[in-house]
Amino acid sequence: DKREGSGDLLAGLPLWVCKTVGGTTVHWAGASLRFLEHEFKAKSAYGNIEGANLLDWPVDLNEMERFYSMAEDKMGTTGTHGIPRLPGNNNFKVMEYGAKALGYTDVHTGNMSINSQPRDGRPGCHQIGFCMAGCAIGAKWSTLYTEIPAAEATGRFELRSEAMVLKINHNKQGKATGVVYVDADGNTHEQKARVVAIAGNAVETPRVLLNSESSMFPDGMANSSGQVGKNFMRHMTGTVYGTMPGDVHFDRGTQMAGIVMDEVKNDPNRGFVGGYYMQTLPGFGVAAIAGNIGAMSVDSPGKWGRNYTQEVVENYKNMAGMWLVGEDMPQEKNGVTLHGSDKDQYGLPIPKVHFEDHANDVAMRNHAFKAGSNVYAAGGSKKQYQLPPFPSTHNMGTCRMSAN
């Protein structure tokens, strides 16, 4: 879908969402981490951070714990409810060795919503890899083959795929009464509803609210605060690859079943607030590494030619990879707005997404780059590559929840 990116985003803004039956649960890697206690109260925990639009959540970990537990049981999250963790692949073993050599202790294969053994009518993981392309056997939890088929089996559920909501209707009291949508054949319908649930991810959710303006809601529905579309976040991310002395074959096995959790603490003495995880990340193929290492690494071997062939292609089986992910700062200037003139195939203004890194994000990423490189060096790597963030993957914010 056409969209416009600005700031630190690529102009065409590729968003890693999945516009398909099952949504982004088809594409996700399955990592299922809880908020830490201090993350629910970011404003109180971090204080006044210049340029950040921090706010405490109106809920805390104690209130959310039972809901976390219910979700983990439903999804079969490893490391919870007596469910064994997934076995580590070579990519994890390399990271684990280096991390423990440096003194890290909280290192394991994580809490993954991927069956480590048969459960809930689904098989255990076969370690096929490429989890983000969809799970061929259904070991990874996704609504595509869990909740949606179960709902269809009741006879009281109708799935209308390839439909696009144009706007949300409301009554004189301002309560939503249904939606106007276009079906797969291009026909427009009005669907009345007692309840309208909006779950379009961090770009399409504010977009439909902003497109639902009316005389009662001139700035868009549910936008009395003026915060709809604002505070777009994507996590602090970055990637470190290391060329190891032996074969790794990091494309084999569960993609992100491996994590170092020691750095997720909130320790401002490191030069930033909040913390980050180091998680295993596989190769996405030689072509993808050409586009990432070749294009963006400071110490780049190039995207093609002899240096690229020698450093990347010939060493592909020896490469290990990790993803760095931490909390980024919400900023009011980062967000989703509607384009003034450019329209999509439905006649709706395309979304404009603006994002700029906060200084805290940059400081955290630099610390994480060094830590990740040190992990691989401790494992025997002589060469590490530090890659900037992917354009947009963990899309968050834009519809803020607060106490009032």
Task: Label each region the model flagged.
Residues K2-T24, E39, N48, W57-D60, ...:
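FAD cofactor-binding and catalytic pocket of flavoenzymes
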Residues G22-G47, E190:
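N-terminal accessory/precursor segments of enzymes
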Residues T154, A163, K167-Q173, V179-R252:
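Glycine-rich loop(s) and the adjacent beta-strand/alpha-helix scaffold that form part
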